[in-house]
Amino acid sequence: MRNCLPMELNLRKGDKVWVEDKDLAWIAADVLDSFDNKLHVETSTGKKVFVSPEKLFRRDPDDEEHNGVDDMTKLTYLHEAGVLYNLQRRYALNDIYTYTGSILIAVNPFKKLPHLYNGHMMEQYMGAPFGELSPHVFAVSDVAYRAMIDDSRSQSILVSGESGAGKTETTKLIMQYLTFVGGRATDDDRSVEQQVLESNPLLEAFGNAKTVRNDNSSRFGKFVEIQFDTNGRISGAAIRTYLLERSRVVRITDPERNYHCFYQLCASGNDAEKYKLSNPRQFHYLNQSKTYELEGVSSAEEYKNTRRAMDIVGISQDEQEGIFRTLAAILHLGNVEFSSGREHDSSVVKDPESRHHLQMAADLFKCDANLLLASLCTRSILTREGIIIKALDPNAAVTSRDTLAKTVYAHLFDWLVDKINKSVGQDPESRFQIGVLDIYGFECFKNNSFEQFCINFANEKLQQHFNEHVFKMEQDEYRKEEINWSYIEFIDNQDVLDLIEKKPIGVIALLDEACMFPRSTHESFSMKLFQNFRFHPRLEKPKFSETDFTLSHYAGKVTYQTEAFLDKNRDYTIVEHCNLLSSSKCPFVAGIFPSAPEESTRSSYKFSSVSSRFKQQLQALMETLSKTEPHYVRCVKPNSLNRPQKFESLSVLHQLRCGGVLEAVRISLAGYPTRRNYSDFVDRFGLLAPEFMDESNDEQALTEKILSKLGLGNYQLGRTKVFLRAGQIGILDSRRAEVLDASARLIQRRLRTFVTHQNFISARASAISIQAYCRGCLSRNAYATRRNAAAAVLVQKHVRRWLSRCAFVKLVSAAIVLQSCIRADSTRLKFSHQKEHRAASLIQAHWRIHKFRSAFRHRQSSIIAIQCRWRQKLAKREFRKLKQVANEAGALRLAKTKLEKRLEDLEWRLQLEKRLRTSGEEAKSSEISKLQKTLESFSLKLDAARLATINECNKNAVLEKQLDISMKEKSAVERELNGMVELKKDNALLKNSMNSLEKKNRVLEKELLNAKTNCNNTLQKLKEAEKRCSELQTSVQSLEEKLSHLENENQVLMQKTLITSPERIGQILGEKHSSAVVPAQNDRRSVFETPTPSKHIMPFSHSLSESRRSKLTAERNLENYELLSRCIKENLGFNDDKPLAACVIYKCLLHWRAFESESTAIFNIIIEGINEALKGGDENGVLPYWLSNASALLCLLQRNLRSNSFLNASAQRSGRAAYGVKSPFKLHGPDDGASHIEARYPALLFKQQLTACVEKIYGLIRDNLKKELSPLLGSCIQAPKASRGIAGKSRSPGGVPQQSPSSQWESILKFLDSLMSRLRENHVPSFFIRKLVTQVFSFINLSLFNSLLLRRECCTFSNGEYVKSGISELEKWIANAKEEFAGTSWHELNYIRQAVGFLVIHQKKKKSLDEIRQDLCPVLTIRQIYRISTMYWDDKYGTQSVSSEVVSQMRVLVDKDNQKQTSNSFLLDDDMSIPFSAEDIDKAIPVLDPSEIEPPKFVSEYTCAQSLVKKPSIASTSKQII
């Protein structure tokens, strides 16, 4: 590729270059000096070397500041060093996907990145133009899907890369996306889409294994064809596999593993025991390597997943049983060992353990163990004389055993693929399909064998197809831009393909020929190969080997060792093995080994060339790919240690060469690799020809003039781009750097002059200041000397005065101390004499007190003893009286119990009377009389109870009086005892009995308190009984009132019928019965009829037949329906900001008493009418109109309806009937502002339906607004390209951005103004306007923020200024709309505001992570901040993003965040919820009074609603009726 670049001889000191390095592939360097043919450069490691210019590549100085480009074609210098560095920079920032034109490069991150692959991310890429969002495997998948739909042509996606590069995961992601966009909305686990997805883990279990480089390496090639119908839905699928590595079944090396399915089966628990399996270490086919477990993978769980995948794909339980029986048989077969037999060159089973495993294998295969042993130890040869049995030595028997194991596993794998294809099913009517190819990449190891030869042959084929496609894309680009491209050529690899596959002397043909001869060896094969291709440029013979050969592939030279070529190419099938297993009693085993034709059984061996078969499969694959439009995904493994964030440059560079990425770059370099839009070219290189910038606004003409002035000829001008040959952009950058250097020198010269002048002025001013300061210091020093002398004299005077005063004060204080001591001694003596005198007096007083107190206590104890004897006597007397009172209280409780039972009986009878009141009015009147009699009897009993209670109270009063008398007597006795001093001898006896009397007294007091408590309880129960009796009396009165109300209502109805004109009555009576209405209408008559007692309307009911009455009801119902339908269909407008339709409908329902009906017909008509009205007309006008009306009607129902109960319903109806007679308006329709209406279940159900209708209307308005807003927001996220005349004025870095918003933001403002005007014209409550505007701004925030994170061209400084100016306009709009309508809309823009604020802030590199998270972007998550920081680039001032230390800290936090189970996507989710409930609407919308609103004029045309209009006449009529 380097030969395609011209020698860049114009390098000069200071230029940035790339230097080849043996450890890092390429390393950054700076040119220090240039000599004749050498350049002196200094690398980034500090090493200084001399290098030839042709071995250097230019390096873009902006690469260090930017975080790489998402498309390699945008690189300033397109070469392998730039490609490698760009991938490394992006990989360090977790940007694992990069484009090279239409080719996607995917670098394996070796860690989970769930935020890149969730459903929300799929929705973002669905339908997005290619290249508009960040590179992603979903973007390639979407391009293929859209191309298939738009062009009606099949597509293919080719995924390649070396083992461990992530091909399998990438393929699964592609299939996952295709099933997402092409799947059906179904929950069926057996859908085609689900089966296609589940085929991946199933094939991984049987076709993937751990290798040295990869823990989940695919050991086969896979091509999945996903078929689509005409609607773009998946209709079928087919899987083709290539070159399964059969030898891995019997032979593995450490640290590799066998296929995953074996380890899963050993860890399956009960199933493993059933098949006599144990630890994998016990089986020869698994213990050849010491690796049995994979880190972070549970074989038991994977076994369950495999079983689940089998169920979804459609493999029955019997077939699953057969699959795992076969796997277990293979493991047991591997443990069968052989030893030499008695005969020469014969073999037998080695030991009993081998015999056991042989028997287990035979049991699992369901065949005879002896026949199985014979097929392993002998071989049958068919000759003319007959069949000859040949014994095999132990080595040959082991080979036969391994051949059987490989054959069984290969048949099992083929059956599994075929079963998946049959289960998923292929659509024969499918017009197009998308094929996903997951095949091994180019391999070059230290030792390369037959597998590497086949793999590299396949990659040569695919590379040829890839080169043709890339060259075709280049041609399409040139043709689209209308430039000349006919002379561009590219290198083809057809010669190496001919060397490999051409007949009759290609490598494959010679290999097959050698395999057909038993005595051929790899030496003879190599010799014949060199004899035929001695002078071929693509074939070389190594110096130190006679049998190896080297092929020059497109990715480099590979040396193959031919020792095992012949054995691996021979695919022998032993007929005895096939015959044995085809006759198995196990249907599954016999099914995977169909019976062979008779002619094929004549030989014990059937030879088949692996290379020839692979060549045919590859040819069929290429034919399929040639019929499709290809898309390429190149997977790259960044390091050999499988660790994240480690990038091995040499390994990646080798993979880029092997994957054809650098070949695509080379093809691009052969033409015009550098392409720039005219506007970008003029913006960057316009300073090279400033004299042309103001002449014309034609950017193409300006580009041509700039290139002509510089004398460049290797360019072509397309329609929208300028195309430059390789190296030309370097010349332009060099010239630009020279101009910038000259300008910089001029600026520096002027700046130095200015700085020197400023320094001189500053120095002169400083000198003057210093002189003035020195003079001031001298003057201040002289003044300070004089002031100090005067101060010293003053200090001396004050010191002398202070010393004299101190001596005088000391003398005075000494005299005072002497005087005070003398006075204190005399005072203390006097005080001691007074203290002794007082103590003597106090002792005398206490002695006298003690003497008198002892006498008093003796006398007092005697008195108390006498009192206790007397109280004992009185207490006994009182106890006898209290016992009598207690007996009387027991009788009272018995009477109370009987009374309670009678009350309960009364309550039961009252309930019975309520239930039976509907049987007839006569029965009710008789029951009322009975109840009155019962009430009188209960009243008498109540009076008796009251008298008993009064008597008991009187008795209690008498007892209290007696207690008072006894207390008085006690006091008298106490007075008498004061004079009984002579009774001292009886004190001892009284003291002994005092304690017992006190105890008895306490017992009696407790019994007295209990008696009082019982009396109080009895009184309380009597009061409750009285209350119940009053309630019964009230209910009886209500029944009487109801009866009178019903009679009054019947009279009113009678008078109404009498008012009817005689002509009308005659007309009704004269109609025939045949004119009755349909029964369906009769069913609805109960909607508006109020049931009336039949005995009051019998005279008139006899005059009208039942059919006539039903017809009148049906006609009235039809009229009601017509009125409601007209109110719904016509736009009635608003009256005083109140919706007329809602008020009229509510008043009609109230007047017709529809809320009390058991029918839902009228409510269904209203709901259906509203839904029909929403479907027709202009949605912008209809939806707000009905949002206003439906919410108003809902509020009226919410505030005035309440649920009905059984006991209150009758009372409420009778109350309304009576009130209707008294009030004229109530007769024809209750007042809207009246108390709550008792609603039945249909009315409550109607309220719920209306609530759902309001939510539906709100959701439709919101969704329509989002649909209108989405295309406007798509153009607002990125600043538009300014015209040349305007842009020329602000091209300098110091240019001030325009503050006025562009037309795109003006369209947003117009949209918001239109929204507000529509809502306010239809008088939508401010509550709904506030919610709608808030959700609209939330959607603006979501759309702008997600677009910012997915499009790198939007994360620029100038674009941030542009979006910020637009957001400021939105802020003005919110301020003008006021909080009543805007609500918290400004806070909904927090995410985009903070993101844009981060883009436009200066000196990002000085910001710490805490400052960014806490001050700049407190709302954003660490993942979102990391995404913006890594995608940001300054297109205006060229400043850098945050520092690398901050990026590293962010990466650590993002990795920790990845380990959480919660959603960790950096994109925002759209909130589709309804942000209110019926209660919120009721609280937010002001009170609405429908009675104050005059209905429309057409309402008077309907007789059923005339009462709503003609209120005065109705009032007068009601007065006459009364």
UniProtKB/Swiss-Prot annotation:
What UniProt keywords are attached to this protein's entry?
Actin-binding, ATP-binding, Calmodulin-binding, Coiled coil, Cytoplasm, Membrane, Motor protein, Myosin, Nucleotide-binding, Nucleus, Repeat
Q: Which InterPro entries match?
A: Dilute_dom, IQ_motif_EF-hand-BS, Kinesin_motor_dom_sf, Myosin_head_motor_dom-like, Myosin_N, MyosinXI_CBD, MYSc_Myo11, P-loop_NTPase
Entry coiled-coil feature ranges: 889-1059
**Superkingdom, natural source:** Eukaryota
Its primary localisation, in coarse terms, equals cytoplasm
What is seen without this gene? Impaired nuclear movement. Abnormal nucleus shape with invaginated envelope.
Similarity comment text for this entry: Belongs to the TRAFAC class myosin-kinesin ATPase superfamily. Myosin family. Plant myosin class XI subfamily.
Instruction: Output this protein's name.
Output: Myosin-15
Annotated source species:
Arabidopsis thaliana (Mouse-ear cress)
